[in-house]
Amino acid sequence: MTGVYTTNTAEAVAYQLKHAKSNIAVVDSENQLQKLMSVRHKLPDLKHIVLYGEDQSYEDEVINWDDFLALGSRLGDEELRERLEGQAINQPAVICYTSGTTANPKGALLSQDNVTWTCASAVATYNLVEAEEVMISYLPVSHIVAQIADIWMIPSIGGTIHFADKDALKGSLLKTLTAVRPTRFGGLLH
């Protein structure tokens, strides 16, 4: 898994997805889809593009989120168990890329064990309560803090994640905080 910033150029997106050998890309808007399609020919490993938040149907390699989830629901418990058992602690879980301001982005590879240990350490350090924690996801998921907290840590303890609007950092976050009333709220120093 790797995250790509929505502000990245099409060329930066192509570089990162090719470097990561991504075979599935998830985009959250028609704009991001068009950006990706403009460099699609440079991505030989890419097999599918999933468009999140759109109900539209597409041809070929682009599918909407609901159709993507339906594909997963067809997997039986046995196949899922086999995939889980096929994972090893030293296998890659995520490649976290730098912003690439001065050159091509650099990728830092985090293993399954690294992510698991980091989540367990954060749960213990912050005394998170299993099945009771509620958090708001508002940082770009391409950021490692969002990946650890929103994708791995809170789900690993049965907590709840509320995804804020795309414009959360432009003013709507306070409204979301008031409505959701999270048990924890994290942020980054600027």
Language-model features: locations:
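Short beta-strand->loop structural element characteristic of the AMP-binding/adenylate-forming
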Residues: 1-34, 107-109, 159-166
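Short hydrophobic/charged patches on amphipathic alpha-helices used for structural packing
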Residues: 14, 81-84, 174
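Conserved S/T- and glycine-rich ATP-binding loop of Class I adenylate-forming
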Residues: 25, 92, 98-101, 135, ...
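Adenylate-forming
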Residues: 25-37, 182-190
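ANL superfamily adenylate-forming
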Residues: 31-89
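Conserved AMP-binding/adenylation subdomain of ANL enzymes
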Residues: 116-134, 141-190
